[in-house]
């Protein structure tokens, strides 16, 4: 059910496209709140880009590892604005990508504080998972 709830946040038409994907996506609360704060059009574009990556498209303009950290970013350009959704892999739970939070990017480089925030949320995620 988690997958369907996640897809509904982006755009209902994505539910119609349930082909085999290479990974599942889980949104942490901050990522969900970020997406809900965006317009339907922006959410739809982000969702379509994520779906392309889930189906195996390898394009650093859509999904890119950030330096030497364990953090990746889903990248979307819409109406001259750059949207970023930070994420990491949890390979213990099949193949799962966990999105931590998102930003509307305003600078050339991804802010270090946003990468640090994603890294902290990643650590918390695994601590909580291991304590369950």
Positions of the model-derived regions?
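Basic, Lys/Arg-enriched alpha-helical interface segments
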Residues: 1-82, 91-97, 104-132
